[in-house]
Amino acid sequence: MSGPSDYQPSNPALQWIERRLPILGLMHSSFVAYPTPRNLNYWWTFGAILSFMLGMQILTGVILAMHYTPHADLAFKSVELIVRDVNYGWLLRNMHACGASMFFFAVYVHMLRGLYYGSYKEPREVLWILGVIIYLLMMATGFMGYVLPWGQMSFWGATVITNLFSAIPYFGESIVTLLWGGYSVGNPTLNRFFSLHYLLPFLIAGVVVLHVWALHVAGQNNPEGVEPKSEKDTVPFTPHATIKDMFGVACFLLLYAWFIFYMPNYLGDADNYIPANPGVTPPHIVPEWYYLPFYAILRSIPNKLAGVIGMFSAIIILCFLPWLDAAKTRSSKYRPLAKQFFWIFVAVCILLGYLGAQPPEGIYVIAGRVLTVCYFAYFLIVLPLLSRIETPRPVPNSISEAILAKGGKAVASVAIALVAAGALFLGSLQDARANEGSDKPPGNKWSFAGPFGKFDRGALQRGLKVYKEVCASCHGLSYIAFRNLAEAGGPSYSVAQVAAFASDYKIKDGPNDAGDMFERPGRPADYFPSPFPNEQAARAANGGAAPPDLSLITKARSYGRGFPWFIFDFFTQYQEQGPDYVSAVLQGFEEKVPEGVTIPEGSYYNKYFPGHAIKMPKPLSDGQVTYDDGSPATVAQYSKDVTTFLMWTAEPHMEARKRLGFQVFVFLIIFAGLMYFTKKKVWADSH
């Protein structure tokens, strides 16, 4: 990609290959001898991070696809079975799901770095446009991937976003029908999205090759925005840039691992742990955080077609940036006004993301319209105007001259600002997903909380007893097999105890030789049976409300923590919104409805349930279940024990996740330290 190479391998076999297919020379000229500006800072490391993350997403995605079932009736269950029954399936899913967010985080940093340092200017226009194409492909891939788990937010997100194409005149309805494969989102839609989600990453990889090719033709930009003029301005890509990139990737992996092992659901949505239900619309349909700024632009424009045009224009306009900004000076380091407006633009994007997570009503709509105007004004008014009126500061004559005055404090402060802004952004997302119209649940001290938390075996066994004697008459545990009770990290029953426990249940099986269905005693390999044969029977027995399956209830329920707790949650690894909520609801029943509160007939008042009206009668009362270990037979103890058990049913491999996370963190810290000191040694003679 860097041009002809005179590299010749010393090995005779490799020489034979090189004469016929000079692939080794191409690799040497592109990734070893390639001259790299010596003043590149760590913002340039995100290119290597993105390459690593793309490879990681493709690898984990291919393995997950081996076990995934793209069928509307089986997709949700297949994902859960991957997590529970495939060896390290929980790790693969966490890597892939959290990896999508990390991929977008890295690409946003990469794009903002290009904006700040003018990496879109001549001669890098094609390089920049290819980057925008990659970003568009990433957005399409991420959206289709989010649909695949077939949870509530997946289904309704697909419905809302695909419906946008109906705004296109003449062809819109036909496009929507083609995407759906029918007249509503369903199984054909899921199959289409799975196929495209599998294909697009390889297309992204192909465009990345073109992107890297264009980079090697035009050369890398640098913080000063001046082209290398002599050998003193550059260093060989390997080992200098390679080692620096490896250190940067190692540091990024620490953040990545933080989410994988300790905060896997921090960036997700509780509603997506509920199977897709076309008959129940979520209170807030909110896309993933990396789409929120554009979602805010879409919703801020009242006309549907204009909103769609505005949303796509907000991305496409990036392709025209090389011609909108005609300033001769590339880097904003030497453009005081451009630097100020750049940070204003970053603030506008963050605020748009905040608004995208809020309900489309009142002041949020007005603010969205103002910020949408600001977003487009930056590209269409500010940049063209600045290129004509701004007087830049003197630019260094060469890269080597600029290195003498280099400092790192600004980079550190910008990094801190980005982390703080990102925390605020993610916190706004949690606020939007709060349970409205109810008191916030009180916190609890859970044994499984924190990086070294473990399940209390006694609480798990007591919780199972409460479930069996109280909850099992209405609620199933369809994702838990009896054998799971004997697995490490669970209630710690012996194989014999599990067999005896399973035999108490009657399992419908068959057909037998006569073609009839029959009942038999349960076996360890069987799953907990549902108390009802189907959903219609469940509704008929419960006044029209279908009791939810409890396997995932502590993940499928949550509440917004609000400011500033969501910031602290990231650092304290607080992930117990679900258990706190479930425990609070079990204890939140009150016989007397407060004055001024009206609930429908046949409902019960619960101060923690959204809207306070719940169809489920009070399930627990003091003395209802007898414990053999002397634990108090109170509602508070029952609720805490059964919630602990339900947290285990939601994630049986939690202890393994945290244990492996500690080992990975130790390795990454040591690896990052080795890379840092190696980098110091390699670069010692280059400054």
UniProtKB/Swiss-Prot annotation:
Residues 458-643 form the Cytochrome c domain. Binds 2 heme b groups non-covalently. Heme 1 (or bL or b562) is low-potential and absorbs at about 562 nm, and heme 2 (or bH or b566) is high-potential and absorbs at about 566 nm. Binds 1 heme c group covalently. Heme 3 is covalently bound to cytochrome c1. InterPro entries: Cyt_b/b6_C (IPR005798), Cyt_b/b6_C_sf (IPR036150), Cyt_b/b6_N (IPR005797), Cyt_c-like_dom (IPR009056), Cyt_c-like_dom_sf (IPR036909), Cyt_c1 (IPR002326), Cytb/b6-like_sf (IPR027387), Cytochrome_b_C_euk/bac (IPR048260). Heme b b562 binds at residues 96, 197. The chain crosses the membrane at residues 46-66, 126-146, 160-180, 199-219, 247-267, 305-325, 337-357, 363-383, 410-430, 666-678. One of its GO terms (biological process) is respiratory electron transport chain. Residues 404-434 are annotated as: Internal signal sequence. Its main location: membrane. One of its GO terms (cellular component) is membrane. PROSITE patterns: CYTB_CTER, CYTB_NTER, CYTC. Component of the ubiquinol-cytochrome c reductase complex (complex III or cytochrome b-c1 complex), which is a respiratory chain that generates an electrochemical potential coupled to ATP synthesis. c1 functions as an electron donor to cytochrome c. This is Cytochrome b/c1.
